[in-house]
Amino acid sequence: MSSPMRSRRHLLALLAASIGLQAGWAATPALGPLYADPAHTDLSGLWLVTGGFYFAPDRSVPKLLGEYKATYARRTEAFNKGVAIDDLTADCLPAGMPHLLTVPYPFELMQTPGRVTFLYEYDSVVRRVATDGSVVKPDPDKVTYHGDSFGHWEGDTLVVETLNVRDDTQLDFTGIPHSDALRITERWRRKDAKTLENTITLTDPKAFSEPFTTTRTYQLKPKWKISEYVCEENNRNARD
């Protein structure tokens, strides 16, 4: 059994160690803001697209070529008749890029040195865009729904390039097609304190006769939050 004196010495040693640890914490400098990127314009926040959910607010479409023009004509006819078109999202598959840029759900933009991250409520999609040149060269044989994105800053504008997008995705809910040669260029800038602007240029030499550009705006929603999105809980569509 330990003696009272020995127990007191043990307690005093623990107290001394605790005081020393607290002193060490006090001497540790406070960390800076978690998402600070002082070198660039702050684009961070929770945003919601405005101007409707067509790819272009004025409902214009790229000048389509050959089979892509015929495919869109067929889909447009079905759409105008209220018939469900062949859309991957009907089976809870991702909308893909650039359709993701116009879905009616909010996204959070997180900006850190060397990286910008887009957290979408829709389908719980995450886009990680390196801006420090650290991205490995994309493999053209590995196409995905949202492609490979890499970015850089031009003054107060974030420029994001995306390629290697699956060719069975569509530009918007009306079914505008594209090929595997699609290249998406986004130019994000803060128009004012509550508005984010994204000028989008699509280049696709197989499907479009010329590049197509449109501008989308997003409204800041500081009191909103990203909600859970589970498509599989309500996987129903008229065509099913």
Question: Where do the language-model regions lie?
Answer:
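PEST-like low-complexity, intrinsically disordered acidic/proline/serine-rich tracts
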Residues: 2, 25-240
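Bacterial N-terminal signal peptides
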Residues: 13-22
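Bacterial N-terminal signal peptides that target proteins for export
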Residues: 2-14
